[in-house]
């Protein structure tokens, strides 16, 4: 799964042009209530359930889709529909779908303030083994005071939270590739000494990046292209 960008002005064309990566087609999954519509009209009231998600995942795989992408929510928006108020946590959700599919790639979405990067790296490596290399990670910085407030987590200013996300991605990637027990990281947000994740992934999992980002995450996004794929995602 690779990001396809339009050719820059003056870029070589025709026989001299570099081949472009094929476009991959994925599906946003309804792992949250009212996922596809905020409307009160719901043809399928239990659209968020695992059974519904498994059925859609199998249909998507049979139809040739390349990946499945979930939304991470911890609290809904209230009102008559309580939009996204009921949801399946995406690490657990991905494990179940990876175990029952054969080809399609399955992502998990992780909020940086909620999952420690070492924990995310360990869970991700486990999911990679369950799916035999088909798992991917979507890292989001998080902004919702509604959600984080109920956990006592402070929402950082925009630039700072994206700088923290850059450190987060570097930690996860480092834990997946370094010699066990040798990973070291110290920053404003994290201190990791003798970091250890075993088993490591069978390959470098795809890491999703945020579409709206600071210079820190732009730099990290460039570095994450060393993994098989980098995609753009919403914050």
Predicted segments — roles?
Residues 2-100, 200-207, 214-224, 232:
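N-terminal beta1-alpha1-beta2 module of alpha/beta enzyme domains
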Residues 3-23, 113-227, 231-235:
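Internal, glycine-rich beta/alpha segment that forms the wall or movable "lid"
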Residues 41, 109-111:
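Short strand-loop junctions, especially beta-strand C-caps/beta-turns
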Residues 64, 102, 131-133:
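Active-site-proximal glycine-rich helix-loop-beta segment
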Residues 64-72, 106-107, 136-140:
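Short beta-strand segments at enzyme active-site cores
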Residues 66, 103, 181-182:
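A general structural signal for well-ordered secondary-structure junctions
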Residues 100-108:
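Conserved catalytic cysteine-centered active-site region
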